[in-house]
Each structure stands twice: as structure tokens, then as C-alpha cells.
């Protein structure tokens, strides 16, 4: 059995296969998945798993160069934003880009995969751009 926090097979496979610049989206339960983009559906029920816990586990294994958020998170999700700011201050998220929610959905078309959580708070979505460890 793995010793690291991430146990989901599909998510482990995805992270292990990422190259520099590849895009992964972690989204709430309502984020649309564009045709042709892989869906890794972790959602069990409302709030399980939640956005922040899922993000922290992904960050335990993924090197991130930059991330993007929808601007709406500032008004709608101050608690989630506070956690994202802490992770950003730790250096876990790299450069931050802010987009409209519509621009965010367009960018998600480039994702290698979208990870759907059970989060039911709006705008709890993030685009992660893979970095390198060297």
C-alpha cells in the first residue's frame, strides 16, 4: 500500500504522467466537464470530498508552476480563498492568474483531466499547471 496521502488510482496515474505545462483542474460538483476531457470523479455526496482537502492531497504529490482562479471566488468563497492564500504563501501553488468564470471554463478545455469533488460551494475550482522538480 502507498505511504503517501494520495490513494486514488486514477489520480495517482494522472499525476505520475504529467509533463511540464500540463493542466489539471480540481472542481466543485457543478463544474462542467468539456467533451474529450478526462473526468476523475471523486464526488460521493454533498461536501465529500471537499475542495480544500482534495487540493491538499493533490499538492502532496504534484509540482505546481502556476494556478488560475475565477475572480468570483473573492466575493463568494472567502474561506476557501484564505486557504488558497496560505498554500500560495507556502510556495505550493506558484504564480496566480485570475480569470472570469467563463474564461476559467474555456481554459478547462485544455486540461488533461478534471477532478470532480463533492464540494457544493460555488466557485471552488482551481486550474493547476504542472511544474518540474528540477
From Swiss-Prot:
It holds the Pfam family RbsD_FucU. The active site is at residue 20. One of its GO terms (molecular function) is intramolecular lyase activity. GO terms for biological process: D-ribose catabolic process. Substrate binds at residues 28, 101, 123-125. The keyword Isomerase applies. It catalyses: beta-D-ribopyranose = beta-D-ribofuranose. GO terms for cellular component: cytosol. It comes from the Bacteria. InterPro entries: D-ribose_pyranase, RbsD-like_sf, RbsD_FucU. Its main location: cytoplasm. Its EC number is 5.4.99.62. The keyword Isomerase applies. Pathway: Carbohydrate metabolism; D-ribose degradation; D-ribose 5-phosphate from beta-D-ribopyranose: step 1/2. Keywords: Carbohydrate metabolism, Cytoplasm, Isomerase. It is found in: Cytoplasm. PANTHER family: D-RIBOSE PYRANASE (PTHR37831:SF1). Catalyzes the interconversion of beta-pyran and beta-furan forms of D-ribose. Belongs to the RbsD / FucU family. RbsD subfamily. Homodecamer. HAMAP family: D_rib_pyranase. This is D-ribose pyranase. It comes from Pseudomonas fluorescens (strain Pf0-1). The gene is rbsD.
Amino acid at each position: 500500500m502507498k505511504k503517501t496521502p494520495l490513494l486514488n488510482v486514477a489520480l495517482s496515474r494522472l499525476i505520475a504522467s504529467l509533463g511540464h505545462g500540463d493542466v489539471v483542474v480540481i472542481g466543485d460538483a457543478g463544474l462542467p466537464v468539456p467533451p474529450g476531457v478526462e473526468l476523475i470523479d471523486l464526488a460521493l455526496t454533498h461536501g465529500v470530498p471537499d475542495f480544500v482537502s482534495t487540493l491538499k492531497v493533490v499538492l502532496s504529490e504534484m509540482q505546481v508552476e502556476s494556478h488560475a482562479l475565477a475572480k468570483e471566488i473573492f466575493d463568494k468563497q472567502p474561506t476557501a480563498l484564505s486557504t488558497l492564500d496560505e498554500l500560495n504563501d507556502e510556495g505550493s501553488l506558484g504564480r496566480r492568474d485570475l480569470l472570469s468564470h467563463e474564461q476559467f471554463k474555456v481554459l478547462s478545455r485544455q486540461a488533461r483531466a478534471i477532478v470532480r469533488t463533492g464540494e457544493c460551494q460555488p466557485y471552488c475550482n482551481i486550474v493547476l499547471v504542472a511544474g518540474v522538480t528540477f
